[in-house]
From Swiss-Prot:
The gene is CACNG6. It is found in: Cell membrane. Regulates the activity of L-type calcium channels that contain CACNA1C as pore-forming subunit. GO terms for biological process: calcium ion transport; regulation of calcium ion transmembrane transport via high voltage-gated calcium channel. The keyword Repressor does not apply. The lineage of its organism: Eukaryota, Metazoa, Chordata, Craniata, Vertebrata. Residues 15-25 have a biased composition (Basic residues). Interacts with CACNA1C. Identified in a complex with the L-type calcium channel subunits CACNA1C, CACNA2D1 and either CACNB1 or CACNB2. This is Voltage-dependent calcium channel gamma-6 subunit.
Length: 260
């Protein structure tokens, strides 16, 4: 009888300790399953924007510069550039669509020559088709984009802390970070547009003469626009999750609370 009481007390003690650990874990988490699911959905939306942002900043298809096709020549030249480097390509005119007056698109196969911009290291301006970049504007666009990525990474860290540690106060911080990163990316895109216009206007007087150019924005810049908008939308979702539930509960009452 004594041994049975001892084992019974030991079993009760273990069950009580396990229950306290579960209660402590739930109190530390602080998120109901429903609320945790909403946070994960908003984080998934922000992750899509983050992926597009990294893809946009890391690629060099922000803008394409196209020369006009020359009569009697089998090749023509085009270029595409981003925040970090520029690539010039020699394309076969037979591969260029017949309805185009200019060389391109830059995705066509051809002999490519890609170089990183030197104003990040030596401070020199780059020359593309006898035109000179304005390094101050290009540097500003790149720095703003990198700041946007850094703030975006901080926002991801805040939301991960919310899900793992239950620190709900970081929801608001994460929302601010994602919103700020989206704004910074959009500002970087606008600054880059000004750098393209400055490049087209800074024609070198040295021979040979600069060719006529047309330009068109490419898919990397489109990814940046989409990333900025999605990050802003994700920030709005996180901000909605920080609001108290009673205004929404009064507008959308639960079906179970009906008058009998």
């Amino acid at each position: 009888m004594m041994w049975s009481n001892f084992f019974l007390q030991e079993e009760n003690r273990r069950r009580g300790a396990a229950g306290r650990r579960r209660a402590h874990g739930q109190g530390r988490s602080g998120l109901t399953p429903e609320r945790e699911g909403k946070v994960k959905l908003a984080l998934l939306l922000a992750a899509v924007g983050a992926t597009l942002a990294v893809l946009s900043v890391g690629t060099e298809f922000w803008v394409e510069l196209n020369t006009y096709k020359a009569n009697g020549s089998a090749v023509c030249e085009a270029a595409h550039l981003g925040l970090w480097k520029a690539c010039t390509k020699r394309l076969w005119q037979a591969d260029v669509p017949v309805d185009r007056d200019t060389c391109g698109p830059a995705e066509l196969p051809g002999e490519a020559n890609c170089t990183y911009f030197k104003f990040f290291t030596t401070g020199e301006n780059a020359r593309i088709f006898q035109r000179t970049t304005k390094k101050e504007v290009n540097l500003a666009a790149a720095v703003i984009a990198v700041l946007g990525l850094a703030v975006m990474a901080l926002g991801c860290l805040c939301i991960i802390m919310v899900l793992s540690k239950g620190a709900e106060f970081l929801l608001r911080v994460g929302a601010v970070c994602f919103g700020l990163s989206g704004l910074l990316l959009l500002v970087s895109l606008e600054v880059f547009r000004h750098s393209v216009r400055a490049l087209l206007q800074r024609v070198s007087p040295e021979p040979p003469p600069a060719p006529r150019l047309t330009y068109e924005y490419s898919w990397s810049l489109g990814c940046g626009v989409g990333a900025g908008l999605i990050l802003l939308l994700g920030a709005g979702c996180f901000l909605l999750l920080t609001l108290p539930s009673w205004p929404w509960g009064s507008l959308c009452p639960k079906r179970g609370h009906r008058a009998t």
